């Protein structure tokens, strides 16, 4: 018996036809939730290194899995929601800023990108493990 895989969309369509769309979505949502919990936990640990009031850590949340507009991809959004409005400062902290012609790099400069890159392998392993279950 031989297997020929032509592309991911075809494989997904075949799996959906065997197991059903709702079952596949529930399985992928479970995998996304588990992997995003790992990422949030890792990100919160990294944010501890430059914590001031702790508001950025407290307001860090994740959305429920949703379907991206214009594609069939499922995703989870990491966002900062709360009374301290940390969402306004996260961008400045991640990318730095310029004031009076001088570039400033805060203590938390690039921490989200670094954490994302460092945890990518483990994130994918969690997704694979959950999808195989």
Where do the PLM segments sit?
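Aromatic/pi-system hotspot detector in well-structured domains
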Residues: 89-91
């Amino acid at each position: 018996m031989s297997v020929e895989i032509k592309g991911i969309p075809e494989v997904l369509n075949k799996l959906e036809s065997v197991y059903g769309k709702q079952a596949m979505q529930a399985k992928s949502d479970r995998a996304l939730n588990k992997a995003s919990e790992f990422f949030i936990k890792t990100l919160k640990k990294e944010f501890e290194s430059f914590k001031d009031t702790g508001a950025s850590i407290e307001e860090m949340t994740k959305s429920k899995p949703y379907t991206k507009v214009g594609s069939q991809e499922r995703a989870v959004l990491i966002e900062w929601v709360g009374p301290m409005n940390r969402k306004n400062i996260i961008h400045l902290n991640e990318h730095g800023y310029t004031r009076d012609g001088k570039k400033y790099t805060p203590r938390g400069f690039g921490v989200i990108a670094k954490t994302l890159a460092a945890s990518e392998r483990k994130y994918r392993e969690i997704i694979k493990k959950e999808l195989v279950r």
